[in-house]
Amino acid sequence: MAKERALTLEALRVMDAIDRRGSFAAAADELGRVPSALSYTMQKLEEELDVVLFDRSGHRTKFTNVGRMLLERGRVLLEAADKLTTDAEALARGWETHLTIVTEALVPTPAFFPLIDKLAAKANTQLAIITEVLAGAWERLEQGRADIVIAPDMHFRSSSEINSRKLYTLMNVYVAAPDHPIHQEPEPLSEVTRVKYRGIAVADTARERPVLTVQLLDKQPRLTVSTIEDKRQALLAGLGVATMPYPMVEKDIAEGRLRVVSPESTSEIDIIMAWRRDSMGEAKSWCLREIPKLFNGK
């Protein structure tokens, strides 16, 4: 018990100051104490731990190997203690320590980068921006693993506590490589025609919810990939057909790397922001005000 009492945050702060300032006198000046008080604290620590922390053979204060080890590991504790204090103070003011924004794969993560420095200027809230696919985004919100979700409006809500707001409308186009045989089929394309060609899809990331598929027919052969960029690359490689967000393939279409299969297959979907009303903090409220500004004019 004596050893536990001796190794206090105060003692570790004294050791840290001595190392950074190079002497007991300079450390005492930084800490607003007299050198004899620091000497007493260190001597008491040495006695109770039964170790030698300082090499006192020279003119300059030097740590022994044991002292250096205790200092370096102690700094980890000091950093953790400081962070704990900061987080507690922030939480007391109503600012969350962590906030998770989940974007569905159709929503580009870089669109949210302007939030990061703005939020950091207001609080020490740690921000996570995570991508999920289809039902995986909504599952995170339902299970409390997301504070805010930005995703296509799937027209389902699992709780009256979930609120939402439309951000913008996204146009989707049905595309394939320019030499894909589907372009030789007569329009409008029937399901009998479409089912002959491999569809490319991004895997739903839901763990417990029933997984969803969009724009794929039951008996259609398919290639499933992990990301929307993998889906685009598979299209460019001529491996199949798929619906893609127009902004993600606009340049590919303009430069002839992809071609719209059927203009009649073009569709629009609302992208919404959703959140739980039963868990509101300052950081979340701030983000709910700021996120719509990122999409003004879309």
UniProtKB/Swiss-Prot annotation:
GO terms for molecular function: DNA-binding transcription activator activity; transcription cis-regulatory region binding. Positive regulator, may be partially responsible for expression of neighboring gene dlsT (yhaO). Keywords: Activator, DNA-binding, Transcription, Transcription regulation. Belongs to the LysR transcriptional regulatory family. This is Probable HTH-type transcriptional regulator YhaJ. The keyword Magnesium does not apply. Pfam families: HTH_1 (PF00126), LysR_substrate (PF03466). One of its GO terms (biological process) is regulation of DNA-templated transcription. PANTHER family: HTH-TYPE TRANSCRIPTIONAL REGULATOR, HTH-TYPE TRANSCRIPTIONAL REGULATOR YHAJ-RELATED. Residues 24-43 bind DNA. Residues 7-64 form the HTH lysR-type domain. InterPro entries: LysR_subst-bd (IPR005119), Tscrpt_reg_HTH_LysR (IPR000847), WH-like_DNA-bd_sf (IPR036388), WH_DNA-bd_sf (IPR036390).
